[in-house]
Amino acid sequence: MAALLMIIGLGASAQKKKTAAAGGKQFQVYAVGFYNQENLFDTCHDAGKNDYEYLPAKGWNGMKYTSKLKNMSRALADMGTDVLPNVGCAFIGLAEVENANVLKDLTAQPPLKARNMQFCHIEGPDKRGIDCALLYNPALFTVKNVKLVPYVQELAKDSAFKTRGFLTVRGEMAGDDVAVIVCHWPSRFSTSFYRESGARQTKVVKDSLLRENPDMKVFVMGDMNDDPTDKSMHEVLRAKPEISQVGEGDMYNPWYNILAKEGKGTLFYNGSWNLFDQIVMTPNLLNKDAKKKDFSSLKFWKNHVFRRDYLIQQEGQYKGSPLRTKAGGRWLNGYSDHLPVVLYLVKEKL
C-alpha cells in the first residue's frame, strides 16, 4: 500500500477520478469535506428568523454578500485539489447557510458551476436561520434520498427551543452505498449536556442506517462544537482515535491525534486551537488488518485540515487565525472563523 500511496501523492493527473497503479492494480481516489460557512446569509429577511444582523439596516449589503459568495466558492472549489487537481471533493458538508436561495447563489459561482456542483438542503427550525447542507458533484456522488432528522430536546424545560437537526443524505459513490449525516451540534453557550444529546441522537441515526443496510458506508460530519477528545465524540458517539480500537458499533475519528498530538485545529479561540469540524466514519471504511488490506470497496486513506494562505489572517492581533468575514464590527472580506477539513478515500478499480 505504501507504493500506492506514494504514487497517488506524487501523481499529477487531473482526471474526473484520479487513478493510480500499483502491483498491476488500479485505484481511484475520492475526496470528501466539511466547511462551516460562518453566517452565509443573503440580504433579505426570512419570516420567523432572527437574521437581522445580516440585513442592510445592519450594514450587510449586496456587495458584501457577493464578496462572501465569491470567497466561499473559491475555498470550496480548492478543497481536495491537493490530491485531485481540477476535481476536488465528491461532496462537502456545510454549516451556517441561511436557505436554499443562498445555496443556489453559491453553486452558481464560476468555480462551483464549472463542476456542476449541486446541493441538498431542507429548511430547518433554527431561530437564527442557519441550516446544514450538502454540496455534491453528481459525476462522483449520486443522491438517492434526503431527510432532515429533527434534534429532539431531552429535557422537558427545553421543549420549546428548536435547533438544527441532522441532514441525512443517502446515495452512491464508486458503486458503494454511502450515507452522510451533516451536523451542527449546539454551541458552547449551552452546557456539554446538549452536545452529548446531539451525539446520542446522531448515533441513533447512524445505527438505523446500518440496521437497514449493514454495508452502508456512513460518514458523520459537521461542526460539533466539541473537540475529538470531548465526551460527546469519544464516549457518546464512540468515535475512537485509533483504527485498532474501533469495534462493532464504534466509529473512527482521524482528527483526534491531529489535535491531541499535533496541536492543529480548525478554530482558534483564546490563544489555542480547537478542532470542532470533524468527519468520522463507520468501521467498514477501514482496513483493520495491516496484512490483508482490501480495497474492493471504498476505504479511508488520509485526512488533513485544509489550509491556504488566503484563509489565514496575515497580520495584526489575530495573525495566524482563520480570516473571518467580519470581526469586532469591522468587515474583513474574509472567509470563515473555521477552517475546512478534507479526507481521502481509495477503491480498487476492477
What is each residue range found by the language model?
Residues D42, N101-K104, R128-D131, F189-S192, ...:
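Extracytoplasmic/secreted cell-surface and envelope-processing proteins
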Residues Q15-G24, D207-V218, D226-L350:
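Metal-dependent phosphoester-hydrolase catalytic domains
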Residues S192-P214:
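A long, amphipathic alpha-helix that forms part
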Residues Y35-E38, A95-E98, H121-P125, N137-P138, ...:
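Active-site-proximal beta-strand/loop segments in catalytic clefts of secreted hydrolases
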Residues M1-T19:
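Bacterial Sec-dependent N-terminal signal peptides
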Residues A14-P110, A114, C120-C132, R200, ...:
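N-terminal, active-site-proximal structural segment of metallo-dependent hydrolase catalytic domains
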Residues G24-V32, F41, L140-T142, F161-H184, ...:
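Beta-strand-turn-beta hairpins that frame and shape the catalytic cleft
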Residues V97-D177:
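Structured beta-strand-rich core segments of catalytic domains in phosphoester-bond hydrolases
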